[in-house]
């Protein structure tokens, strides 16, 4: 066990809650102590949902452990059915209740309720949130889809009938899942494909029973839906997509893949496709972004997609790539090999911070924790993956997928760099007479009183390696853009050490610049 102030994923029962909360007419009975009810706040406070998750907690206390906690669970399950009248019930235990070993699923099934009761066995001390969501969705699909079909391969589509697909993966508390779903739905409809079921988002148990009626499945988030899609493929012969439409290039590949599975022509849709990212990334005001060093960390789906967009569409250089999801370590390693870098597979945020400090990138793309890390290190950052905070569940339309999602990516990733450059330019020209506080105002007001000039610092700064910076060299260093200032300082100090120069003057700084600029 590791004590930490931050975790990238919660226990697996949080993943189960994400599935139950995303669906309709489903109720989750969770065998848990009173302290585990904190999870409701993830949905009401962070995601800002207008209703509580459909979860009933047994909320046993310490004094109950000497009695029959199994009876508590059965009473809670019976009361939940009578009050909420769900079409299906999920039953499981939290990480704390798992230690009691009460077998919640078996106890609930013994009640003989007139609805499907789906037991969830989620090992809290071996697995985490995304796996819990994937396993829960798989168990629900297997229980409900299998009960409505004889297991035979799907029937071939009649001539002239529109192709039909399912959209799998969007959940509650997912990073931009609501808007991604709207964007992908629009693209699928433009291809002339009918959508049979979207799951788990807003799906009912009756909807999941109709999953076998589709011709193929679109997997939007492999962390959630891949296991279920693989089972549907084996059981009903439904193929599934493997391309994630994040970025212009990936979206075009996705449209071609979907069109191939549906047997339709993708070119009319591709010819009408519009995204401002390709032109913006080539435009004059963006050329200074070329070659910027970027560090990427998040869930595997978003991290791998972000690396492709960064290198192929924005001209960045990926210097770090990693994930906290060990189940998808293979995908991250394969992607890292393409960029010739060492992957970082860890759920320890301290290791991530150490890697960022070591690489000193010019942009960090990550989760909420990487936002904190980058802020401490003074590096621009954009959030690309869960876990996130409340500001990453915006009221506005802000997808990550599709052509509109590519526009959002450009704004989200590039604006931190552009605003940083703007601040640098203001600082660089602050001493010019045009920007002086006592200059005449165009508003006709009296000029401001001349400000007190601070005394120039003449004391030389000494680093831990006994290198001294002259005050004029230090001032000149501040005129270098912030996103390369650290590199300029390191190169200059390295240049000075190699030549046994103890005092870095303005001339030393210029000599170092000329040396490394060759």
Curated annotation (Swiss-Prot):
It catalyses: chlorophyllide a + oxidized 2[4Fe-4S]-[ferredoxin] + 2 ADP + 2 phosphate = protochlorophyllide a + reduced 2[4Fe-4S]-[ferredoxin] + 2 ATP + 2 H2O. [4Fe-4S] cluster binds at residue 36. The active site is at 285 (proton donor). GO terms for biological process: light-independent bacteriochlorophyll biosynthetic process; photosynthesis, dark reaction. Its EC number is 1.3.7.7. It comes from the Bacteria. Pathway: Porphyrin-containing compound metabolism; bacteriochlorophyll biosynthesis (light-independent). Substrate binds at residues 420-421. The keyword Lyase does not apply. It is an enzyme of class 1 (oxidoreductase). GO terms for molecular function: 4 iron, 4 sulfur cluster binding; ATP binding; metal ion binding; oxidoreductase activity, acting on iron-sulfur proteins as donors; oxidoreductase activity, acting on the CH-CH group of donors, iron-sulfur protein as acceptor. It holds the Pfam family PCP_red. PANTHER family: LIGHT-INDEPENDENT PROTOCHLOROPHYLLIDE REDUCTASE SUBUNIT B (PTHR33712:SF7). Protochlorophyllide reductase is composed of three subunits; BchL, BchN and BchB. Forms a heterotetramer of two BchB and two BchN subunits. Component of the dark-operative protochlorophyllide reductase (DPOR) that uses Mg-ATP and reduced ferredoxin to reduce ring D of protochlorophyllide (Pchlide) to form chlorophyllide a (Chlide). This reaction is light-independent. The NB-protein (BchN-BchB) is the catalytic component of the complex. Belongs to the ChlB/BchB/BchZ family. HAMAP family: ChlB_BchB. This is Light-independent protochlorophyllide reductase subunit B. It comes from Bradyrhizobium sp. (strain ORS 278). The gene is bchB.
């Amino acid at each position: 066990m590791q004590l930490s102030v931050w975790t990238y994923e919660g226990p697996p029962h949080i993943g189960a809650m994400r599935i139950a909360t995303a669906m309709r007419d489903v109720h989750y009975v969770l065998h848990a102590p009173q302290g585990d009810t904190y999870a409701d706040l993830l949905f009401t406070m962070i995601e800002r949902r207008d209703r509580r998750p459909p979860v009933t907690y047994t909320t046993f206390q310490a004094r109950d452990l000497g009695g029959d906690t199994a009876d508590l669970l059965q009473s809670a399950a019976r009361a939940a059915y009578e009050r909420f009248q769900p079409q299906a019930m999920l039953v499981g235990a939290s990480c704390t209740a798992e230690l009691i070993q009460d077998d919640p699923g078996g106890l609930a099934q013994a009640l003989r309720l007139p609805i499907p009761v789906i037991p969830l066995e989620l090992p809290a001390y071996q697995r985490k949130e995304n796996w819990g969501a994937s396993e829960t969705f798989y168990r629900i699909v297997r229980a409900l889809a299998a009960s409505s079909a004889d297991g035979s391969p799907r029937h071939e589509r009649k001539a002239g009938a529109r192709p039909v697909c399912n959209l799998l993966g969007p959940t509650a508390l997912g990073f931009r899942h609501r808007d991604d779903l709207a964007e992908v739905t629009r693209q699928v409809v433009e291809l002339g494909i009918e959508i049979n079921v979207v799951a788990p988002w807003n799906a009912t148990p009756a909807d999941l029973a109709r999953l076998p009626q589709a011709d193929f499945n679109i997997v939007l988030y492999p962390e959630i839906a891949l296991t279920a899609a693989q089972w549907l493929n084996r059981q009903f012969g439904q193929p599934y997509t493997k391309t994630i439409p994040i970025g212009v290039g990936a979206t075009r590949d996705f449209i071609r893949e979907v069109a191939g599975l549906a047997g339709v022509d993708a070119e009319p849709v591709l010819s009408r496709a519009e995204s401002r990212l390709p032109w913006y990334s080539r435009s004059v005001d963006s050329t200074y972004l070329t070659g910027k060093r970027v560090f990427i960390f998040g869930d595997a789906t978003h991290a791998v997609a972000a690396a492709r967009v960064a290198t192929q569409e924005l001209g960045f250089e990926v210097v770090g790539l990693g994930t906290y999801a060990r189940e998808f370590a293979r995908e991250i390693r394969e992607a890292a090999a393409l960029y010739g870098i060492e992957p970082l597979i860890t759920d320890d945020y301290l290791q991530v911070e150490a890697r960022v400090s070591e690489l000193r990138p010019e942009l960090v793309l990550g989760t909420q924790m990487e936002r904190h890390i980058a802020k401490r290190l003074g590096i621009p950052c954009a959030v690309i993956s869960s876990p996130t905070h409340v500001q990453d569940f915006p009221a506005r339309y802000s997808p990550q997928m599709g052509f509109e999602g590519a526009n959002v990516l450009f704004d989200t990733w590039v604006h931190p760099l552009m605003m940083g450059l703007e601040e640098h330019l203001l600082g660089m020209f602050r001493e010019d007479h045009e920007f002086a506080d006592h200059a005449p105002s165009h508003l006709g007001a009296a000029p401001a009183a001349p400000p007190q000039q601070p005394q120039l610092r003449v004391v030389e700064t000494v680093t831990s390696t006994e290198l001294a910076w002259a005050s004029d060299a230090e001032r000149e260093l501040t005129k270098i853009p912030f996103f390369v200032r650290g590199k300029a300082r390191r190169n200059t100090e390295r240049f000075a050490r190699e030549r046994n120069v103890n005092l870095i003057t303005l001339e030393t700084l210029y000599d170092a610049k000329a040396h490394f600029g060759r």
